[in-house]
């Protein structure tokens, strides 16, 4: 029965992101069947942006929030990219986490920066995006300790597959 159960699982696991679910789809195209979990929309903030542009982007994120055909349409996620300034990155993550009903995606490959950012906003259950073949063990430890989702990068599909396989072997 376990083998049958495994064979009938959707090709992509369902993950919970804030109040939303992603994945768990059994079809690739909407016309094949209805999609089970809707897409989430994200806006990007980056440490490479000046303060005025960051504030303008945050105000724009707040404005995109309306109801259409009985469904709330909004920017559900804020993707915060690290361009090398660790202190500014952590502060930017805090600003993004202060936006209500938004999930923060922490995008950094630097383990120390990731640790500081996750520690600063872990109660908001962000996504830690930045594990790769070189840092996946440390990133996995950070994500597992905080109980959050870990995003993985790879130079190509083969590298991505190998990194994900190593993470699954480690229990993630």
Regions found by a protein language model. Give the residues of each.
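Active-site/ligand-binding-proximal alpha/beta "capping" segment
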Residues: 158-172
């Amino acid at each position: 029965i376990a083998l049958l159960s495994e064979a009938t699982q959707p090709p992509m696991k369902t993950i919970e992101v804030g109040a939303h679910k992603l994945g768990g789809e059994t079809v690739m195209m909407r016309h094949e069947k209805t999609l089970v979990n809707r897409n989430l929309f994200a806006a990007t903030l980056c440490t490479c942006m000046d303060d005025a542009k960051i504030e303008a982007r945050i105000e724009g994120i707040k404005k995109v929030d309306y109801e259409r055909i009985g469904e709330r349409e909004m920017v559900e996620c804020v993707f915060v990219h690290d361009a090398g300034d660790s202190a500014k990155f952590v502060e930017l993550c805090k600003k993004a986490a202060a936006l209500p009903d938004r999930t923060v995606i922490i995008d950094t490959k630097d383990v120390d920066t990731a640790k500081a950012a996750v520690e600063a906003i872990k109660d908001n259950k962000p996504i830690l995006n930045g594990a790769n073949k070189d840092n996946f063990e440390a990133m996995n430890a950070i994500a597992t300790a905080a109980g959050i989702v870990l995003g993985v990068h790879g130079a190509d599909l083969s590298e991505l597959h190998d990194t994900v396989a190593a993470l699954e072997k480690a229990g993630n």
